[in-house]
Amino acid sequence: MPRPILATVHTAALRHNLDRARRAAVDARVWAVVKANAYGHGIERVYEGLRGADGFALLDLAEAERVRALGWRGPVLLLEGVFDARDLELCSRLDLWHTVHCDEQIDMLAAHKTLKPQRVFLKMNSGMNRLGFAPERFGSAWTRLNALPQVDEISLMTHFSDADGARGIAHQLEVFERATHDLLGERSIANSAATLRHARQTRGDWVRPGIVLYGSAPDFPEHDAAHWQLQPTMTLSTKLIGIQTLKAGDTIGYGSNFTAEGPLTIGVAAVGYADGYPRHCNTGTPVLVNGVRTRMVGRVSMDMITVDLTPVPEAKFGTEVTLWGRSAVSGAVLPIDEVAQAAGTVGYELMCAVAPRVPFAPADGE
């Protein structure tokens, strides 16, 4: 028998979260962002739950080919555009839309021989300072693209750096609108946080929700997933494979960094950092045992963690342990954002970091 660890993908939750994003976006069309292998869930596994979107936005040609292989015939957008001039031929064959964020990509298009003009999203660097044309150069980039026979429609996009925080979007939005007010083209400016927190200000033709589709709050800890009416789409679970009874003064695991203050029963769960569970989690990290919230104690090992069984005295060998997501026993939810906070990171990273050795399965009945 294999180890009892399992990552479960919840298709119904994906549909629910997509609908939540669509309701927030009012009249805009929705790109379902499935980059990074659908935030670690697997593109093939999320397709059924997200096929109600108006398009799929992703990172590279390999992911685009997988979406097309699933039968999707609608829009597909390469969020970073092409990395090599040879990629443009495949863009033509797969009928892809792609981002243009630098002069080199315009040069590639200008030299490309194609019978079918391509749809592009021209990206502005409105203040995030990653990809995109500076505002003062955006108009000239648009003019150059518009003159190319290789280019069909030009849409306009930017990306917010602080839509999830106190700084907000006002400055970047002003920069974008000032530089694009006289340019034709559909607009796409709202990511997950902007879609939920700034829907009125960021109404455009397209929104680009990512993390909210997977049930994580884009502005945690200010708001949790329940506040935004999001449901977890991934559950990482395992089982207890051992029980130990400690007395006062006993220590646990490598480094002996946890010492029992009195009699304590602990459970050993089959999960560790080799499975993608973050090693930076330490004593106090929340877990569910038999659907009841308790805490991890000691350090994360390669293949095991130890948990405090005080709240669940009935726990035994084989009892369910939920690392994040929804307990199959009680239905209780342990938000991935809480676990990420304990590890000093974000839910995005935990989803993407689930190791290849962890098997995936759809939720029962899905």
Swiss-Prot record:
EC number: 5.1.1.1
SMART domains for this protein: Ala_racemase_C
GO BP annotations listed: D-alanine biosynthetic process
InterPro entries linked to this entry: Ala_racemase, Ala_racemase/Decarboxylase_C, Ala_racemase_C, Ala_racemase_N, Ala_racemase_pyridoxalP-BS, PLP-binding_barrel
Catalytic activities: L-alanine = D-alanine
GO cellular-component term (any): cytosol
Family assignment from sequence similarity: Belongs to the alanine racemase family.
Protein name: Alanine racemase
Record lineage: Bacteria, Pseudomonadati, Pseudomonadota, Betaproteobacteria, Burkholderiales
